């Protein structure tokens, strides 16, 4: 039984589990996550607009 433990220890030292590629490391996943993050980081053109009914200071983008 101790031989199996020694063999397992040697194998884990030579080939650690962190060397295996994970699903999150795939380039396609990273590109999709980056694209999704860019979509959410765009400003909303309606944010900060005045409430309805529009006052004279409103822009046509918000009120029109």
UniProtKB/Swiss-Prot annotation:
Disulfide bonds join 49-58, 50-62, 54-63. The modification Cysteine amide is found at residue 63. One of its GO terms (cellular component) is extracellular region. It is found in: Secreted. GO terms for molecular function: ion channel inhibitor activity; toxin activity. The keyword Secreted applies. Residues 20-46 form a propeptide. Keywords: Amidation, Disulfide bond, Secreted, Signal, Toxin. Residues 1-19 form the signal peptide. Expressed by the venom duct. Belongs to the conotoxin M superfamily. The cysteine framework is III (CC-C-C-CC). This is Conotoxin Mr3.5.
